[in-house]
């Protein structure tokens, strides 16, 4: 097996990260995160979360390309839950088609996230239904990669959406 993707929540901002990613030959996922992991949820603030996340991801993608990482190796992740309030996460999800329109494969990771708990009132171990709803909406909006804890259930849900959308032959 081995690694097939570098998924860096810091978007290669640490010293040597560009070089390591470039030299690996792997796909690279650029993740939006406002702040740092230990403090990112303290005071997240945006004027327009979708525009700001889009601008950040495009800028980091350009930085990656300048560092010698081919555009074809890049994946973008809007970073649901990474320095965002519930309102930010919901607005960003509503704007997902715009992020897909940036021209990079989009990865969405919302499985068991706190945003599901905030909306449904469910604890982490009871968030499957909310996660499946978001996974199917993300795929329908054009997200190419869905990160999930519940692989079988998510695959089944995504296959059903694809069948309804007459894309079952591509699965």
PLM regions with names:
Residues 4-63, 83-171:
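Active-site-adjacent loop and "lid" segments of alpha/beta metabolic enzymes
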Residues 80:
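Active-site metal-binding loops of divalent metal-dependent hydrolases
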Residues 60-73:
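Phosphate/pyrophosphate-binding loops at sites that engage ATP/ADP/AMP, CoA/4′-phosphopantetheine
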């Amino acid at each position: 097996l081995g690694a097939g993707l570098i998924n860096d929540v810091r978007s290669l901002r640490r010293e040597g990260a560009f070089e390591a990613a470039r030299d690996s030959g792997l796909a690279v996922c650029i993740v939006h995160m406002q702040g740092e992991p230990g403090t990112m949820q303290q005071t997240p603030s945006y004027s327009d979360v979708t525009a700001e996340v889009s601008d950040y991801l495009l800028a980091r993608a350009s930085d990656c390309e300048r560092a010698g990482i081919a555009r074809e190796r890049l994946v973008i992740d809007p970073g649901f839950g990474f320095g965002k309030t519930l309102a930010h996460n919901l607005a960003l999800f509503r704007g997902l088609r715009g992020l897909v329109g940036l021209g990079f494969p989009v990865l969405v990771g919302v499985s068991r996230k706190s945003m599901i708990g905030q909306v449904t009132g469910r604890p982490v171990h009871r968030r499957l239904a909310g996660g499946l709803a978001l996974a199917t909406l993300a795929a329908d909006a054009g997200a190419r990669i869905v990160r999930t804890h519940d692989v079988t259930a998510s695959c089944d849900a995504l296959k059903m959406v694809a069948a309804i959308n007459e894309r079952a032959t591509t699965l």
